[in-house]
Amino acid sequence: MSSSSREGSPDWLRSYEAPMTTSLLSLSSSDDDSPYRESEVISSLPLPDDDGDDIVVLETESVELLTRKNSETKVVTKQVSIEQVFSRKKKADASLNLEDSCAGKENGNNVDCEKLSSKHKDAQGGADSVWLVSSDSEPSSPIKQEVTVSTEKDADFVLEATEEEPAVKTVRKEKSPKTKSKSSRKTPKEGNSAQEILKTEDKDTDTTIAEQVTPEKSPKTKSKSSRKTPKEENCAQEILKTEDKDKDTDTDTIIAEEVTTDQKIKPSSGSSSRLPLVLSEKVNRTKVLVECEGDSIDLSGDMGAVGRVVVSDTTGDMYLDLKGTIYKSTIIPSRTFCVVNVGQTEAKIEAIMNDFIQLIPQSNVYEAETMVEGTLEGFTFESDDESNKNAKTAVKPADQSVGTEEETNTKAKPKAKAKGETVIGKKRGRPSKEKQPPAKKARNSAPKKPKAKK
């Protein structure tokens, strides 16, 4: 039997190897409910039909063949991927909601609730695959049917279970059994390609579900994220402090600048920066401002009349003689200005002028080297030497005898005076310092006379 059954089976059954995954199989011999259903069915999944009744997908081969050759002849079906539930807490909540919803249903639906709960437990343990064997009461044409379980979110899965809506959806039977059997047969290559496509679609759905789940966080996670660690709080406080310090420094600098400007504007008390300007009753118009080209006029230390003004009648020019240098002057009009004499207590305006004089040097007296010749007769001199010289020229020469007598008399008088002084000095005991200078005078005057004789 085994060899004949293998020979009768198609090629895709021979090349198939059973996957090492836990599978859920539902078996029956006919479309109608049979007495062997409860004993032989391991587990079944509810499938929605047009009438709304639960239909169990069964294999039409005989139960005896399947029981004898369970390991050899297994029909290849498309693996249905059940998406794994993301968090364990949500899995537990979903299982509790399933049990509560099943408790309120009738006895007829208890089997379905048990199936849903077992499938949910299997999904918690891992991504176990579900295998379904289906046929349309034809033993020669096994049919594969796609069964997709959509569990994008645990909450949606629980709502569907509580509202008595089946979680497992199948494609409705619209075609005839023959057309389905022909269209459902695929080569192994097509089966492998279909599995790869399903895997890629599962990956895409996983990524989309993950993207949907990430923005929708639970309030616990939001509260955790809103809670800051002490380090983060300290950093935030330090940032606020630095901002406050920067603001304070900015305000301090602005205030300091305002204070400095006020200090510059306000003069210090007791300073001589401000003086009252006094205008005399009569303004002096005799003062002149002079501008000199060339050599500067040095009037330092000079007092009194330093120069003279020469005005020619013919040309109408005015010449100014300053310390021997003659300057040609030209009057140039200008803006009104004043000469101010600044003192310790006040500033007094001494002159107001509307023009100034520009000087151009013409000639110098010292450069001309002029000589002046003449006699000094008739001039008297106060010095003794000059008076003696004048007397010598006027006195006539006298006799020699008279001159000798005068000389002897002049010599005898100082000797007698010297003897008297010594006697008086001894008697009185006083020094003779007072009478020594006249003796020197006599000595000095004695030699002058012989010079005059010569």
From Swiss-Prot:
Q: Where is the composition biased (Polar residues)?
A: 132-150
KO phenotype (gene knockout): Plants show a severe dwarf phenotype. In bin4 mutants, a specific DNA damage repair checkpoint is activated preventing further progression of endoreplication cycles.
Can you list the GO cellular component terms from the UniProt entry? DNA topoisomerase type II (double strand cut, ATP-hydrolyzing) complex; nucleus
UniProt keywords, alphabetically: DNA-binding, Nucleus
| Tissue specificity as recorded in UniProt | Expressed in expanding cotyledons, vascular cells, elongating root cells, developing leaf trichomes, root and apical meristems and lateral root primordia.
State where the protein is found.
Nucleus
Q: Which residues fall in a compositionally biased region of kind Basic residues?
A: 438-454
Q: Which GO terms describe its biological process?
A: chromosome organization; DNA endoreduplication; epidermal cell differentiation; positive regulation of cell growth; root development; shoot system development; trichome morphogenesis
Q: Where is this region: Disordered?
A: 24-53, 103-249, 380-454
Q: Which cysteines are cross-linked by disulfides?
A: none
Q: How does it assemble?
A: Interacts with TOP6A, RHL1 and itself, but not with TOP6B.
Function per UniProt? Component of the DNA topoisomerase VI complex. Binds to DNA. Required for chromatin organization and progression of endoreduplication cycles. The loss of BIN4 activates the ATM- and ATR-dependent DNA damage responses in postmitotic cells and induces the ectopic expression of the mitotic G2/M-specific cyclin B1;1 gene in non-dividing cells.
Q: What is this protein called?
A: DNA-binding protein BIN4
Source organism of the structure: Arabidopsis thaliana
